[in-house]
């Protein structure tokens, strides 16, 4: 420890890890600790974190609990989905996209209460430490970051439990503990650890929390319609919904039909491969629908440019660069392409599948007069001859210069 820290804002869940961190910060840094708990749709009550923080000596005015579900979906999830974002071709970035939001509010609270440091419970082996800290430095350049997992020797659950018992930290006993490390928000739930550390092992069926097995899903497809305005989903089956309400409803529908399960070995930013399983039912449906409405409303070169940029954009989010100038620049371009992405998409949900069932838009670029296979009066097929010859010119020149 170099310069004295006066006040720390801790990203606090109320669980074992962050409760131990809270006490450890008080002991090691001898400073005031402020707790921040975010409700981003993880499905657990967040208010118990208030009582637990009080029990550990945190003043009422230093306990912050915020409902961020609408902000999360509106300002983070939806902008990401405008790009049809997938990391390494599969991952919908459910964990990655939540971290900049938490970092933003950590910094806002730090400025509000006059804190000079922030702290988080991410380990020194994962991506989250990078995401939290890059966000912190981008928004508060002089902030100090305390990452206990990189400092202490409490590197096992047994040691954490022993520390908690020694310091009177209450540990909830909820029956049999899950063998998996789980992280949830409105976009997804992730599973790591346990038998998943062996890539050859198949996940157990009772691991999945949000979805039924596709084998056990209803035998009849369910039809839905999603309405879009300027690239964002705004309603389901003609009913307007807020962003968070809409995503929650898509999660319910997708989970009912076994949609959105993913078993992935991914390349972490810190250099290692990791295996995780994800449930993203609503996001899986939303991605399919968004691509469908774009197919009607985007120009060809806009579509291809977006597809070329998407892997770079996805990596920026995965690696923690949400607040970077390059991500903002890409976002501006992506958002510009969405001004005509308005219309509706019909889907059938059936046993793990999202099946397109029609799309329509008043801004559609699909012109039957040109694309029909029947006789038309607007397209002169003879024009194609010159088009082809001009595009073939370089091949003709090269072939004559270098005959095979």
UniProtKB/Swiss-Prot annotation:
Positions annotated to bind ATP: 11-19, 38, 121
Protein's pathway: Amino-acid biosynthesis; L-arginine biosynthesis; L-arginine from L-ornithine and carbamoyl phosphate: step 2/3
CDD domains according to UniProt: ASS
EC assignment: 6.3.4.5
Species in which this protein is naturally found: Wolinella succinogenes (strain ATCC 29543 / DSM 1740 / CCUG 13145 / JCM 31913 / LMG 7466 / NCTC 11488 / FDC 602W)
Subcellular location: Cytoplasm
Disulfide bridge map: none
Organism ancestry: Bacteria, Pseudomonadati, Campylobacterota, Epsilonproteobacteria, Campylobacterales
Family membership noted in the UniProt record: Belongs to the argininosuccinate synthase family. Type 1 subfamily.
SUPFAM superfamilies: Adenine nucleotide alpha hydrolases-like, Argininosuccinate synthetase, C-terminal domain
Entry's Gene Ontology BP terms: argininosuccinate metabolic process; L-arginine biosynthetic process; urea cycle
Keywords: Amino-acid biosynthesis, Arginine biosynthesis, ATP-binding, Cytoplasm, Ligase, Nucleotide-binding
Gene coding for it: argG
UniProt-listed InterPro entries: Arginosuc_syn_C, Arginosuc_syn_N, Arginosuc_synth, Arginosuc_synth_CS, Arginosuc_synth_type_1_subfam, AS_cat/multimer_dom_body, Rossmann-like_a/b/a_fold
GO-annotated molecular function: argininosuccinate synthase activity; ATP binding
A Pfam family that the UniProt record links to this protein: Arginosuc_synth
Coiled-coil annotated spans: none
Class of this enzyme: ligase
Protein's recorded name: Argininosuccinate synthase
Gene3D superfamilies associated with the record: Argininosuccinate synthetase, chain A, domain 2 (3.90.1260.10), HUPs (3.40.50.620), Single helix bin (1.20.5.470)
């Amino acid at each position: 420890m170099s310069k004295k820290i006066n006040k720390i804002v801790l990203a606090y869940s109320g669980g074992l890890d962050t409760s131990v961190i809270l006490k450890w910060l008080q002991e090691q840094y001898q400073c005031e600790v402020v707790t921040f708990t975010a409700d981003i749709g993880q499905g657990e009550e967040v208010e118990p974190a208030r009582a637990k923080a009080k029990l550990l000596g945190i003043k009422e005015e230093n306990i912050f609990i915020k409902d961020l579900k609408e902000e999360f979906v509106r300002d983070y999830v939806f902008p990401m989905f405008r790009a049809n974002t997938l990391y390494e071709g599969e991952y919908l970035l459910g964990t990655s996209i939540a971290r900049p939001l938490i970092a933003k509010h950590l910094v806002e609270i730090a400025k509000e209460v006059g804190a000079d440091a922030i702290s988080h419970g991410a380990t020194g082996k994962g991506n989250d430490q990078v995401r939290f800290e890059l966000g912190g430095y981008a928004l508060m350049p002089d902030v100090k970051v305390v990452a206990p997992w990189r400092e202490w020797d409490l590197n096992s659950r047994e040691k954490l439990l022993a520390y908690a018992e020694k310091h009177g930290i209450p540990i909830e006993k909820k029956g049999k503990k899950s063998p998996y490390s789980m992280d949830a928000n409105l976009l997804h739930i992730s599973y790591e650890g346990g038998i998943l550390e062996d890539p050859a092992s198949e996940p157990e069926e009772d691991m999945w929390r949000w979805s039924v097995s596709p084998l056990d899903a209803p035998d009849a497809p369910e039809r839905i319609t999603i309405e879009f305005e300027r690239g964002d989903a705004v309603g389901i089956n003609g009913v307007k919904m807020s962003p968070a309400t809409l995503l929650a409803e898509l999660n319910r529908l997708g989970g009912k039909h076994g949609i959105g399960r993913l078993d992935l070995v991914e390349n972490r930013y810190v250099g290692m491969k990791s295996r995780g399983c994800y449930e993203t039912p609503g996001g899986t449906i939303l991605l399919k629908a968004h691509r469908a409405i774009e197919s009607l409303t985007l120009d060809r070169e806009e579509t291809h440019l977006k597809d070329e940029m998407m892997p770079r954009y996805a990596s920026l989010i995965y690696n923690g660069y949400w607040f970077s100038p390059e991500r903002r620049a890409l976002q501006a371009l992506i958002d510009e392409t969405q001004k005509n992405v308005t219309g509706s998409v019909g889907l059938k949900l059936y046993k793990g599948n999202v099946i397109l069932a029609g799309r329509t838009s008043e801004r559609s670029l699909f012109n039957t007069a040109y694309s029909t296979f029947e006789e038309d009066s607007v397209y002169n097929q003879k024009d194609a001859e010159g088009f082809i010859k001009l595009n073939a010119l370089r091949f003709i020149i090269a072939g004559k210069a270098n005959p095979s």
